[in-house]
């Protein structure tokens, strides 16, 4: 069964430009290099929710778990944490459209 990795975070104040450059140049290609398929990205304009929600899809939980247990994943997230705070993620069964 296909699964989706749902990730949320807030961009650190004053780091917005560097953050967007990192996401385009390193984070998205990094996810793809790990075997994930980026599928969604959402920006929260109003409300008390994480500023960014991004999703990546995988064919199954076992392949995703292998990635989440890898040092490459840990390194990619450590780089992301230079630009964001309140990083969190969860795994859900994949379906089309917006998922929380």
Feature roles, as predicted:
Residues 41-44:
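Short, solvent-exposed loop/turn elements at beta->coil junctions and helix N-caps
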Residues 46-50:
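Short acidic/glycine-enriched loop/turn segments that link adjacent beta-strands
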Residues 3-10:
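Active-site-flanking beta-strand signature of metal-NTP-handling nucleotidyl enzymes
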Residues 92-100:
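Short, low-order "capping/linker" segments at domain edges
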Residues 10-22:
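Short, surface-exposed ligand-recognition loops at beta-strand->loop->(often short) alpha-helix junctions
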């Amino acid at each position: 069964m296909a699964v989706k990795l749902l990730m949320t975070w807030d961009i650190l104040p004053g780091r917005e430009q560097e953050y967007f450059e990192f996401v385009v140049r390193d984070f998205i290609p990094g996810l793809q290099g790990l075997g994930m398929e980026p599928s969604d990205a959402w920006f929260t304009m109003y409300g008390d929710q994480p500023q960014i929600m991004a999703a990546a899809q995988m064919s199954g939980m076992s392949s995703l778990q292998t990635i989440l247990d890898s040092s490459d994943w840990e390194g990619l997230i450590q780089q992301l944490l230079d630009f964001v705070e309140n990083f969190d993620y969860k795994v859900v069964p994949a379906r089309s459209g917006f998922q929380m």
